[in-house]
Amino acid sequence: MFAGVIGPFSLAARLLDVTEIMIYCYEEPDMVHVLLEKATQFITEYCKAYKEAGANGVVIAEPVAGLLSPALSAEFSGPYVKQIVDAVQDDSFLVIYHNCGNSTIQMIDSILETGSAAYHFGNAIDMAEMMTHIPAGTVAMGNVDPAGEFRNGTPESIRAATLGVMDACCKYPNFVISSGCDIPPLSRWENIDAFFAAVNEFYAGTAAGRG
């Protein structure tokens, strides 16, 4: 069982306002760092409580960091996520880093430096391109469009989207197919069922010589 928490920069952005924190990163960086230290301490304790309660790990959602430049992400997000990972991750409790921004490929170095056990990316990026940057021993997950397919798509369209991602990415043994983010409310069960059916279809076809 995995728990979920918001990431440090994303939490700070909720507290300050997204637009304001973007400005403060340039105009008052020291203040942003103070807030990030406090946010990181809070999230760390939150993760420890999940760990003590018996969770097997936690997903740290850091989507607002996807709005930063690679340089700013390396300063204001990655190191703070790493502090959390270093404090809570071990063989019995894993951290999955989530970022659904469209610049994650450009900032992948600082993302990988967090040391998370696995990484999850949204549909704003080319997942096949992302996989070329992921070390072979590290799991990466993604990235069927949650809103466009699970919420607003059809069984036929989500089948095509799922098979498309898998065709492009399953040559990497460390790739795991998933939605690109949370499944939106009111998503139709037939679309969710179609996603899993497509996954089964892909692997059945692979076993029979598909691809």
State where each predicted segment sits.
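Active-site loop segments of alpha/beta catalytic cores
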Residues: M1-G211
